Amino acid sequence: MNAIPLRSAVTTQGRNAAGARALWRATGMTDQDFEKPIIAIANSYTQFVPGHVHLKDVGDIVADAIREAGGVPREFNTIAVDDGIAMGHAGMLYSLPSREVISDAVEYMVNGHAADALVCISNCDKITPGMLNAAMRLNIPVVFVSGGPMEAGKAVAVDGVVQAPTDLITAISASASDKVDAQALLEVESAACPTCGSCSGMFTANSMNCLTEALGLSLPGNGSTLATHAKRRDLFTKAGTTIVELCRRYYGEGDASVLPRNIATREAFENAMALDMAMGGSSNTVLHILAAAQEGEIDFDLHSIDQLSREVPCLSKVSPNSDYHMEDVHRGGGIPAILGELYRAGKLNEGVHSVHSATLKEWLLSWDIRSGAATEEAIELFHAAPGGVRTTAPFSTENRWSSLDTDAEGGVIRDVEHAYTADGGLVVLRGNLAEDGAVIKAAGVDPSIWHFEGKALVVESQEEAVRVILDKKVKPGHVVVVRYEGPAGGPGMQEMLHPTAFLKGAGLGKECALITDGRFSGGTSGLSVGHISPEAAHGGLIGLVRDGDPITIDVHERLLQLNISDEEIERRRAEMEASDKPWTPTTRQRKVTKALRAYAAMATSADRGAVREVK
């Protein structure tokens, strides 16, 4: 293998680069630096988001490690939208489109300055996916290191029942219950989110950070090491050291195996989704993994995910589907332990590697605490425990668990023999209501309602869904149909966390269903079907459903069906096509800005990851 010229040489070498060198010198670079790889650090610090509020200085930790290892670090920032704060109002329209803004921003900065490599400091819902999309586009050496999960909240009583521990979903559900008075609600919200970090359950942010481990693009422990623990600092330092080593191998030795598209191959994407099925990850991960595959030109689609969901069992249930939180997953050995159980059961592709290990076997032998050969470093890492102190400071505790959770029968991470279900935690549904597919987080659905038949109650916005629930118009047996909330129809594909949490708070969690061409928060549980494709704005059948129509949802049979005749469907379709404004909401009043209209004009449906289609 031959050496490859640094990308940055166009700005650092030769007479024609004198102007660029002059500007680099103004940033502090020297003659010696012009011979080294320039490594971009994409940070996402903001004071708006608890998952990012602690990231202000962590770029310096990465930069120091890069500098010491022989690289030249250069940091920049991206935006970060907090889905929880944006939830329930017009702010949520901006969440998914922000993924594309982040992808573009990273690409613009890296290519605009001809950087040689990239470290992505991400954490919350759209930031990790946005940076992942950019990394797959750029295909230069990259390492992901996230801000880490929040600690779970302390126990409080809600409606006479002790919630131990609490989290964001506890607070939202409590707000919808008439039995929770103002003082009790204050106690819940004050306890739910005690520290910096991404919300403490297996919600979208933590799910995606776990998946970067399985894709091979981050270091072991990235998905589960708490934001508040000193061990998290080590991950930032190692990320800096690792990226310089990847640069040496690629540019110095011509070793293209270190590039993202050669690490995150189709086989790695299959492993990542196998992990997702096993850990009961957020349904949003389907959207983001499909998008990343498209950006990297990887042959991986919704059919691939459907096949995996039939073959991979659910080995872990974490909040909102149980009382376990990410700190418990970490105590159980984190992502390497889940991957280890899948590996021993023959559920993973072995021919993959990562930014830290040459083979999957080597990776899991060293880092899976159940392998029998785990390193002392791994054992020490997974002993990292919460501090139990309210704080926005990272690395502020060195607490240790007294023991690890290696109970494969009833612990936080089970083996295949003791799996919760033989199928995965995420299921792809099809039928006349979802010809191109829909997604349900089966791990969050009580098995007693895996087959559900009900009558449609149609609304055309998330806001209207909230109103009909809080006004007690939703009754047992209803299927709440929320349409025109897809990528183009919203636009922006809003999350339906408030409607589902309010259904749960109203005691209807097992009595009703909610289906939508929008999406759900990673904190959603219950019979909630999202990502219906094609969406209403693109002529999907969901746009023709009327109040009272019978609908069948069957998780076992993977079915989502509107039970009316083909003749009636065609009659309604012809009527819609002949209307003044076909495939648009009839009563909804919503201000849509130019920025959102630009996204809507290019947005594809959820089955393609809601990426933009640019011709």
Curated annotation (Swiss-Prot):
- State the source organism's domain of life: Bacteria
One of the record's GO molecular function terms: dihydroxy-acid dehydratase activity
In terms of PROSITE patterns, this protein maps to: ILVD_EDD_1, ILVD_EDD_2
Tell me its EC number(s), please.
4.2.1.9
**What Gene3D superfamilies does this protein map onto?**
IlvD/EDD C-terminal domain-like
Q: In which pathway does it act?
A: Amino-acid biosynthesis; L-isoleucine biosynthesis; L-isoleucine from 2-oxobutanoate: step 3/4; Amino-acid biosynthesis; L-valine biosynthesis; L-valine from pyruvate: step 3/4
Q: This protein is called what?
A: Dihydroxy-acid dehydratase
Q: Which gene encodes it?
A: ilvD
